[in-house]
Amino acid sequence: MRLFIILSVASFGAIGVLSQGGGGGGAAGGLLEGGGGFEEYGHRSRGSIIGLSRGIEIGRHYGGGGGGGGEGEEGREHELRGGGLELGGGGGGGGGGGGGGGEGRHYEIGFGGSHFNTPVDVHHEEAIHLKAHPEYHSDYHVADHKTKDFKSKHEVRDGYKVKGTYSLLEPDHKTVRVVDYVSDKKRGFIARVSYRKHH
């Protein structure tokens, strides 16, 4: 039976999968609760760490020794520190039957990203140039009896042709100037000016 534990760090957007071979619930419970590590009592299994995201540094460190009827619990640690996850296993000698230090394995996952040259997918999209038909209609009017400011403007654009008219009260306050104009690509700007009495 294989046990997969997904390690996820949301702030870095990286995910790693820890695969553990071998045995039963003792190893799984121990790994998640602080004991057990990567080996069950009396059985050695091989662990591997698979990086699934860009920028994960994976290191594996082994200790020496072996033997003993069981493994010591000291030295097993799981902690998240400084942008990486460190899983430690191993420890002192077993309780009976043999002397040497237990096998110590040390797994480390960091999120540096500076050592990897992973390809970056670059998608070049073809630009779509749409030519919209320019069209608008605008007009405004001002009639201020206190300052004697009277003016108006009306303009319509259809494609590249613009036509409109504007009028304003002359400084003598008796005459209104009216300008009718047309503008297009062929003829340019053509204006016709006329005057009428203000009433």
Swiss-Prot record:
What is known about the tissue distribution of this protein?
A: Epidermal regions synthesizing hard cuticle.
**Gly residues: bias regions:** 82-102
UniProtKB keywords: Cuticle, Signal
The UniProt entry, under PROSITE patterns, shows: CHIT_BIND_RR_2
The answer to whether UniProt assigns keyword Signal to this entry is yes
**Segments forming domain Chitin-binding type R&R:** 133-199
Q: Which Pfam families match?
A: Chitin_bind_4 (PF00379)
Q: Name one GO cellular component term.
A: extracellular matrix
**Residue numbers spanned by region Disordered:** 63-103
- State what this protein does: Cuticular proteins play a significant role in determining the physical properties of cuticles.
Listed name of the protein: Adult-specific cuticular protein ACP-22
Gene source species:
Tenebrio molitor (Yellow mealworm beetle)
Taxonomic lineage is:
Eukaryota, Metazoa, Ecdysozoa, Arthropoda, Hexapoda
